[in-house]
Every structure is written in structure tokens, then in C-alpha cells.
Amino acid sequence: LYANTLLETEKIKDYSEITNTEDLEAIKEESLIKLGYFLKPNEMFSFLAKKGNANTETESNFILEELETILNGIEQSTMGTESEDDFNQLFEDLDLNSTKLGRSADARNDLIAKVLFHLDKIDFALEDADADVLGDAYEYLISQFASGAGKKAGEFYTPQQVSKILAQIVTTGKKRLKNVYDPACGSGSLLLRVAREVEVDEFYGQELNRTTYNLARMNMILHDIHYRKFDIKNEDTLENPQHLDKRFEAVVANPPFSAHWKGNKNPLNSTDERFAQYGKLAPNTKADYAFVQHMYHQLADNGTMAVVLPHGVLYRGAAENLIRKYLIEDKNAIDAVIGLPANIFYGTGIPTCILVIKKCRKADDNIVMIDASGEDHFVKNGNKNELRDPKDENKINDINNIVDAYIDREPIEKYCSIVTLAKIEENEYNLNMPRYVD
């Protein structure tokens, strides 16, 4: 489609008709700037789909080797260009020889050819600037995979209902964001969810798992995020942060719950600017507050961060209580605590909460406590609980109720309390929800 648009002035309707070397070079140059990669006419999706379903009596329909060559060619076309880092080894996890695709090469070829054939028949509405069929399809496939992936699902996917809450909170009062950051970005879905609420100039993320990191980069590309607008890194965020020189207007995350980290086993952590001022490091067996400290460090003065964590962060003692006290008493940074229903995440049934944190709070003498964990605030769907988000405005919308309660900051019986900092001090900085919401 992009090449065809370039060719309109040359009165050529279809890129596949191009044979002139000069024209190809011109399109390649433009494509690398606009798209970040380049494909020759005989490497286009439609060409391969047609060949894979050709009449075998007259020509070969074997495309597996060709498909692998083309995917490698996409990466090679970016070498030495600005987009190289975003495409480098992007397809390294793809195994076209996997027996899961078929026991024989011919069987695998037939399956891939059928998939390409049916995909080629779909109108992805690429010429419609308001449609994102391709990106939405990819997002749907990730969610379907997550629903069947068991415990591993939480490593790469945040349910859309939770993502929507985080996104709406960090964009409250904003029409545009300079940037958004996720230090445990998984497949990148949470970053992209923020962009559904307001226009976002730049996306930043870091992901430890290599396969999930590739999913995130693909997600950005398929949602038509220009390669200059996203920077996703594959490293351990706590031990090797990649964006320390940046400050972000919105920070969102669903980090791995109570993960292990090096903590005090790494002597450098005690003097790390992200952790040193708190006087204590998060426990080696529970990195939850290490992620909070990292996110707070990266947050811009006018920014908002929202992070999903296990309920234990609200009341656990020792080092975690000291960190919690410092955030409340010294930094006055915790703006809201939102209790979510149990069993809404893939791979775990534990109750979770959202911490909303700011560096410059308007309501600087209280914290909003919202308890959305009760049976009246979700519905059961199979073996999972779900927050309701119907399109019908007259029906109960659990997501809107949470966000509205956060914005309005008005008490609601058995649901929302506006808790003074003095009251929290009386409770020795224990934020356990039942202490404050009847």
C-alpha cells in the first residue's frame, strides 16, 4: 500500500509491476525512512500467499524456505539504518520447521500456505487512518494465547480491563503525553493502551524475557508506531536499567509479583540513586517495592504512575514498611490505593491492588482508598473474575466506577474513603484496605 502510494505520480497502480532498478532503489530509500524496512515486489505478502496456493501441476507451491529468507531479509534491510535495533533478530523465535506445524515439510508448507491464503483475503483497512485492524488482531491473538498459557501468561500480558484503568488514571487531565514508560513491558499492550486514551509522542519499555521482548517490538510495529517513536530494551530493569537518563510523564507497569532480585546481595544497590534514600532495600525475595522505587525515580515532576502489585505491599512490615513510610511521610507521593478483585489475572488468583503515585500531588493531605474487590464490583466469567465494561452506558461499569471515584475524591459507603495522612500515621503506615474502607 505504501509503495503504491509512492507510485501514483508515476502512473503505476501496483508495486508488484515494478522491475526498474532505479524505481526500486527510490522506493527502498523512502521505505526505510517511513517504515524502517524494505521488501521487494516478489517478497510481498500477497505474492507469497498466491505462490503457496498455486496449482502444483504447473508450478511449485513450496514457500517455507522462501518465507524464512524473506523474514531474514527484513532484518538485513535495516542493517546500518536508524531502525536496526528495532528489527534486529525480531523473528528469532519463529521455527517454521517445528513439528507442531506438521510432521513433514509438505504438511508444514500446506498449513502455512492456507494461513497466508486466508489472511490475504482479509481487508485490514490499511488505508483507513482511524482503523487498526491489524494491530487489534495481533492484540487479540496475544490475549487468546495468554488465556491458555497458565502461570506464564502473567509474564507478558495484562488483562485489558486492568490496562484500561491504569491508562485512564495516568492520562487524567491530559490531552497529550510527551512519553510513556513501562519497566516490565511484556508484550507492550499496556503501553499501547495508554495511547488509546491520549496521543503519545514516545514509547519506552524494558523487558527481561527475550521472546516477550520480541512480542513487544512486533506489537509496536503492527500498531503502526514509527520506529523512531518507540524504544524497547531487553535487559533486567532492576539490575541494568536502560533509560535512567529519561523522565516520563506517565509510568505504568504490571511487574512480576513478588519476584526475586539481587537486593542486598549486590553491594551496588545500597548506593544506587533509585534506592539509597529509603534507607532499606526491598527484600531479596520480594522485588515489588524495588520496582516502585525504580518507577518513582523515572517519573517526571508533572507525571503520574500507576502500578499493579500484590496486596502484600500494603501491609508487609520490616524493610517494606520503611519504604512505604518514606513514600507517604517524606515524599507524600501515594495518591491512591485501589483494591482489585482476586482472580482477574492470568496465571494467579491472588488479590491485587493498584498504587497511584505522583511527585507533585494536588490533594497533599489525604490518600484515596477504593475497594473494588467485593462481589458487587465484578462478574464471574468461567474460572476468572472480570470487571464489567459494557458499551451500554446504562449498565454497570466497574472500570468507570473506579476511575470516577479516583477523580472525584468523594467518600462512597463501603467503596471509597478519603483517608487523611494523620490516620495513616496512626496505623503505622499500614495501608491494608479493611482498616479504611468499611
Predicted stretch roles:
Residues 1-170, 228-237, 339-343, 365-373, ...:
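Non-catalytic, mostly N-terminal accessory regions of nucleic-acid modification and defense proteins
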Residues 3-10, 145, 198, 224, ...:
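A generic secondary-structure signal for well-formed alpha-helical elements
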Residues 105-108, 126-130, 155, 205, ...:
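Alpha-helix initiation/capping motif
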Residues 140, 169-176, 298-301:
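Membrane-interface junctions
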Residues 152-253, 258-269, 274-277, 289-290, ...:
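Conserved S-adenosyl-L-methionine
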Residues 241, 245-438:
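A conserved structural/catalytic subdomain of Rossmann-like adenosyl-cofactor enzymes
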